[in-house]
Design a protein with these regions (language model features):
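Solvent-exposed interhelical
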Residues: 94-112
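Membrane-anchoring alpha-helices and their flanking helix-loop junctions
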Residues: 1-90, 119-173
Length: 173
């Protein structure tokens, strides 16, 4: 059921945010460096595809979690515009981003994914969705580690890590 039948703003915002991901991926700038390690590519592909296995459910632990999806989608939109043409699937250094959402946390786009997926499984709760969420979060964590390892080869990124200490949630992680 689409937005026009359900009149759900969550579907509209999620569709908009994912469309922006595709647009910025297509118009991304050329990387200065890009990881050529098989493991990095494997993590990026599995991590990107795993959420595609989330499925709607008849029941949710917390149906009002759709507001987490809305917040996550809005956060994702701001993060994508902050990242702009530096969008990548695999660890790559296009430009070290330090402005916008990146002035608060180092991985705002990943943080938005966590929030959207969490909201989704809380409002569409099944064992399968929880398993997909767990796998997605594991691969997202691995992506962060591999991406930061690659970006830390750039002295500007190491300075940025000292300035912006938190990866996903300010003052926590």
């Amino acid at each position: 059921m689409g937005f026009l039948k359900a009149y759900e703003v969550t579907l509209l915002l999620f569709g908009l945010s994912e469309t922006l991901v595709v647009v910025f991926y297509v118009v991304r700038s050329q990387p200065k460096t890009i990881s050529v390690e098989f493991y990095d590519w494997f993590i990026a592909i599995v991590g990107s595809c795993a959420p595609l296995f989330l499925r709607p459910a008849e029941w949710g632990v917390f149906p009002m979690a759709k507001y987490a999806i809305i917040a996550g989608a809005v956060f994702q939109i701001f993060s994508i515009f902050s990242l702009n043409r530096s969008f990548a699937l695999v660890a790559a250094n296009r430009t070290i981003k330090t402005q916008g959402m990146y002035s608060f946390i180092r991985h705002p786009l990943y943080a938005s994914y966590c929030l959207v997926y969490f909201g989704y499984i809380m409002s569409n709760t099944t064992i399968e969705n929880v398993a997909v969420y767990a796998i997605s979060m594991l691969f997202l964590y691995l992506r962060i580690i591999k991406e930061e390892k690659h970006l830390a080869l750039d002295p500007l990124y190491r300075q940025y890590q000292l300035k912006v200490r938190y990866r996903l949630v300010p003052f926590i992680i």
